[in-house]
Amino acid sequence: MGEKGHLSRVLLECSLSDKLCVVREKQYEVIIVPALLVGGFLILLAIILWLFIRGQRSQRQSPGPRGTASVPASRGRSQEAAGHGEKVLLPLKETSVEGFLRAATPRLAKLQVPREQLLEVLEQIHSGSCGTLYHATMTTKDHPKPKSVVLKALEDPVGLQEVQDFIGRIQFYQYLGKHKNLVQLEGCCTERLPLYMMLEDVVPGDLLSFLWTCRRDVMTMDGLLYDLTEKQIYHIGKQILLALEFLQEKHLFHGDVAARNILIQSDLTPKLCHLGLAYEVHAHGAISSARSSTIPLKWLAPERLLLRPASIRGDIWSFGILLYEMVTLGAPPYPEVPPTSILQYLQRKKIMKRPSSCSHAMYNIMKCCWRWSEDSRPLLGQLLQRLEAASRSADDKAVLQVPELVVPELYADVAGIRAESISYSFSVL
């Protein structure tokens, strides 16, 4: 207090013996200390406000990620990535259909087909929310001879969201690349509306219709084309597993493995199609609840019925159902169980009985696919080994025979699927 008191006395011009000055000195100290504290607080507050305003200005001036989605640094790099099957994302800032197509089309340059090379639209196959399917013929520089394709068209009037989704699906095929057991993209026309996506045409068509035709052939004895043996079922099944392995390598799964979602060539080479669920996983990281609700319940694994996240283990369960479909020549699964009761049926630890046309070896493979716990089901590689081992001793002579013909409407009711979904023989995206 001595040095501070002396200083305050000097400021007040007081003598050491002045009693009144001592009182004034105390009053002075009471005033100056709070004043200094308030002043310091105001200076600190001003500095904080200045730093905040400065940060806000710099944030507004610097270009942020809003309105874009991982746009590559250079256009040349984007085109190079697209050519090598890498994931290429498009700018989202375009607010018009025309602007979006101008930005998207250069990145799909290697897939573009001049419209004049689309020679003929033969017939409409199906019309749905994601576009209309047609049979068409086209030529390319590599294939000057006309070839049949399935053309998917997105026609006016259409909004920006639908256009972005259509282009996204083309990009998804580009990202996947080629695999002999997946339906291939043949080209596209995206510089203006209507937009076209051309996919390979697979004859005779979808596997479910093929299996039903095998029944008719047995009834009428019309030749050998549609004769199917146990060994051929293993042949088809192994190739479907290879397609699923290919998807898994890209961190994807199919989500709806079924005979209706497989196309078959005349040499019995299967092509997995209807990749819409895999596209959703690729684009959004998960399957939307709206899309999940459209999948027939009888093909779903228990965890899917319980609304748990989908995975490749669910595809393994569905693969067991596919084997059942093939060995019964297209019978609906769980024929005695209503679709809405399938979860309760499985919760009682019940599975389908062995069909009379099914060997014990094949039924054992089905049962390991239908284990309740997804972790106890075999991996794709293990399942492939089981099929290869079983096929070595499989019957290649006896033709599978199921004399009853299928009525599609009755089948749809028992299987729990929409009748219109099996009214045409092509299932593509």
From Swiss-Prot:
Q: Which domain of life does the protein's organism represent?
A: Eukaryota
* Subcellular localization: Membrane
Q: What is its main location?
A: membrane
Question: What PANTHER family has UniProt attached to this entry?
Answer: SERINE_THREONINE_TYROSINE KINASE 1 (PTHR24416:SF631), TYROSINE-PROTEIN KINASE RECEPTOR (PTHR24416)
| Gene giving rise to this polypeptide | Styk1
Biological role: Probable tyrosine protein-kinase, which has strong transforming capabilities on a variety of cell lines including NIH 3T3 fibroblasts and on athymic nude mice. When overexpressed, it can also induce tumor cell invasion as well as metastasis in distant organs. May act by activating both MAP kinase and phosphatidylinositol 3'-kinases (PI3K) pathways.
Query: Record-annotated residues binding ATP?
Result: 125-133, 152
Name the EC number(s).
2.7.10.2
Among InterPro entries, the record links this protein to:
Kinase-like_dom_sf (IPR011009), Prot_kinase_dom (IPR000719), RTK (IPR050122), Ser-Thr/Tyr_kinase_cat_dom (IPR001245), Tyr_kinase_AS (IPR008266)
Question: What enzyme category does the UniProt record give?
Answer: transferase
Q: Which UniProt keywords apply?
A: ATP-binding, Kinase, Membrane, Nucleotide-binding, Proto-oncogene, Transferase, Transmembrane, Transmembrane helix, Tyrosine-protein kinase
Q: What is this protein called?
A: Tyrosine-protein kinase STYK1
Q: In this protein, which residues make up the domain named Protein kinase?
A: 119-390
Report the family membership. Answer: Belongs to the protein kinase superfamily. Tyr protein kinase family.
Segments for region (Disordered): 58-83
Organ and tissue specificity: Highly expressed in colon and small intestine. Weakly or not expressed in spleen, skeletal muscle, liver, kidney, heart and brain. Expressed in transformed kidney cell lines (COS-1 and HEK293T).
Q: Which Pfam families match?
A: PK_Tyr_Ser-Thr
Query: Per the UniProt record, which residue ranges are transmembrane?
Result: 30-50
**Reaction equations catalysed:** L-tyrosyl-[protein] + ATP = O-phospho-L-tyrosyl-[protein] + ADP + H(+)
Q: Which GO terms describe its molecular function?
A: ATP binding; non-membrane spanning protein tyrosine kinase activity
Q: Does the keyword RNA-binding apply?
A: no
Cellular component annotations (GO), alphabetically ordered: plasma membrane
- Membrane topology, from the record: Single-pass membrane protein
